[in-house]
Amino acid sequence: MVTYTCDKCNKEFKQKGNYTKHTKRITPCAPEIKNTLIVTVEGTHGANAEVADTINLSTEPIIPTNLKFIDLFCGIGGFHQALVRLNGTCVFACDIDEQCRKTYEKNYNLKPEKDIIDVNIGSIPDFDVLCAGFPCQSFSNSGKKKGFDDKRGKLFESILDIALQKKPSFMFLENVKHIKKIDNGKIFKHILDRINETGYYVTTTELSPHQLGVPQQRERVVFICIRNDLYKKEIDLNFKIPTIPINLDAIFEKDTTKTEKYKISKEEEEILTVWDKMVNKFNIDENLSPTILCNEFQKKYTEEQMKELPSWKQEYITKNKPIYQKYKEFWDSWLIDHKKILTKKEIYGKLEWQAGRKKENDSIFNHFIQLRQSGIRVKKGKYFPTLVAIVQTPIYAKEKRYITPRECARLQSFPDSFILNENDKIAYKQFGNAVNVEVVHFVMSNTLKAYNFIK
C-alpha cells in the first residue's frame, strides 16, 4: 500500500487527498511533540469541563499577514464591520435570510451563501477566524426558549463541523445572555463542552454596548474560542473595560426633515398624554407600580374567580390596590374621562413604568417608550431600550417620534456610510437581530492582540 509522509512532521497518510490537505493547512505543521493537554473550560456562569486531548503542539502561532475570516449567520455584518477595522478580509459568509444577504452584498461586495447546512465545507477558503452570531430566537426572552430541541438551536453544530474540518485559530460566537440560564444551565454547559470537544479552549465574557459608551443596554455573551495548540494559560483574557462616557446626542438625527415621517400617530400621542396625566398625579419620589392595569381597578373578583386568573395578573392586581385606593377619586374620574381610548386596545390599559421613582417635573415624555404586547413600557431616558427583531421600535418621547433606522444603525455601532435596506420595517428587524459592532470589536481586538495576531 502506498503511503504519503510529511517531511516536516513525519506524519503518514494513506490517502493522497488527506496528505495534500495537511500540507496546505493554515498553520504549518511542526516537528511532532506529543503532549496530553488538559483544557479547563471556564464560562462566566461557572461551567467547567476537563477534556484530555492529544495534539501536536507548535512553539509559536504563525501570524497571518492578512487576517482572513468567515462570517456565519452573518446578518448584515456586525462581525464583518469589526474585523475589517482590524484589517481582516472576509472570504466566506452565509445567512438564511434573503434580505440580509442583499444588504450584506450591497455593503461588502460579497454575496453570502444561503443555508449553512447545504455548504460544502471543503469549498470554503482557508481562514484564521470564524465568527458567528448563531440564531438567538431559540434562546432569547423574545423567543420561546426552546434551546437545542429547536432546529435553530441545532444549527450550532454546523459551526463546529466547519471548525473541525478547517481548524481556524480562533472562533468568536455571540448570543443572548439568557442562554446561560436555559434548562438550569444545561444548554450553556453543553455548548462549552462541544466547543472543547472540537479542539478549542473556551471562555466567555458578558458585555453591553452601554459599557463602551454606546447608549443601549443590550447584554450579550461572547464565546472566545482558541485552538488548543495556540492557547496559553498565562494570557489573561479578562480585559479591562475602559470608562467611556455615554453620548446620547451622537445617536440622534439632527436633520428634522429626516425624522418627520417617523412621528407617532394621533392615537398613540393621545394615549401617552392620557397616561402622562396619571404620572403627574403621583408624588415626587413615589415609586410607581411596575405594571399598572388600570382597567382592572373597578372590577370585583370573588376568591374563586381570582384563583382562575393567571398568576402574573393576580400579582399585579394585588400590587395595584394600594395605588388605586390612594388616588381613588382621581382614578375614577380619569377612567370615566378616558375610557374610550384606554379600552380601544388591550395594551393601552397597561403601563409598565421602568423609569424609577418619580422626579420633579417628571413626565412620560422625558423617557423612551415602547408599545409592547405587555403594555406601554416607559424606560429611563439615559439609555435606549434594547433593539429587538420583533417590531417594538423605541419611541423618542421628547420629539414624539419613533427612532429612525439610521439611529438604530448608530445604536448598533454601524457607520453612517452603511447602506440601509430601503424598507424601514426590514431595516428595523435587521438591526434588532444585528451583532453590536463595538462589543465584538472590543472582545476580538483584545484577544487577537493578546495572541499577537494583530498589532
Residue ranges and their predicted role:
Residues 113-116, 200-211:
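Conserved S-adenosyl-L-methionine
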